[in-house]
Amino acid sequence: MPDELPPGPPPGPRDPGDAWAQGPDGTKAWGLFGAAGLLVDDGAGRVLLQHRVEWSHHGGTWGIPGGARHQHEDAVTGALRESAEEAGVPEDGIDLRHTSVLDLGFWTYTTVVGRAARPFEPVIADRESLALSWVPLAEVDDLPLHPGFGASWPALRAAIDIAPVVVVDAANVVGSVPDGWWQDRAGAADRLLDGVTTLAAAGLPAAELGLEFDRWWPRWTVVLEGAARDASAASTAPVDVVRAAGSGDDAIVEVVTAAVAAGRGPVVVVTADRGLRDRVTALGDGVQVRGPRWLRDRL
């Protein structure tokens, strides 16, 4: 720890959330509005862990950067802010994967799970860390873990490689509602892409994907064909735009084949085309199909 950072909690004004929440039985938990932390892996089999300073709650143990949520702050924003403040994690350098929520009724702790979008080295930026380290997955259990993180780690570890994908048959979805889309197919595709981009940023409830935990952020691929290929929207993570050179169905099958081969899944294909449904579900047990209404209801 740098010499210029003396031991003890940071001085100065604090957010109203930096206080103890108390349950009806007298149980206390830090964070008046709940708390959140970030579990980030580097895509190479390591996770970023924090060795907690002795004066902190469960000091001397290893866990993830995190802390009390600020007033009116959502859990994802809180986790990214805390990890930036404590460990120098770049807030724009994390691809969200899922959230796991511990709910005690009067208080919640949200573990936000992400993957580093680009390499970075953590930096001790405040008084709350003795050390920060990228720890190989196989060595996490060898450390003295914070009790809360230790209890959640087995389930989090088991899901570390789950990578859901949603593939959208744009022609089928756009054509499912007679709203005049045939007069401007490119414009209709752009409107669909705007909605998908908003949905991708918000994530999907885990149950929608048949997964555990609270919420997931899949990778989305929207396949355009014909005149819709003239849509102005470009690929912007986590939404990929594929402009099919020929058959849109063939392009969707190629996207799903590549996802399955890469070990990604579950893969959800949004289409009402029966022939396409049969082709994609034959590619693997992890491939599911939803109709256009499923997507439209969420848009």
Annotated model-derived regions:
Residues W62-H72, W181:
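Short histidine-centered catalytic/ligand-binding loop motif
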Residues S56-G60:
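A conserved beta-turn-beta hairpin within the catalytic core of GNAT-like acetyltransferases
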Residues P2-G37:
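Acidic, metal-coordinating catalytic segment for phosphate/diphosphate chemistry
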Residues A68-I162:
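Unchanged
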Residues A163, G175-L299:
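Nuclease catalytic cores that cleave nucleic-acid phosphodiester bonds
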Residues A36-V40, V112:
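Short beta-strand scaffold segments in enzyme catalytic cores
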Residues R46-V47:
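Entry beta-strands of beta-propeller and related beta-repeat scaffolds
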Residues I64, V167-V168:
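Short hydrophobic beta-strand that contains or immediately precedes a catalytic carboxylate
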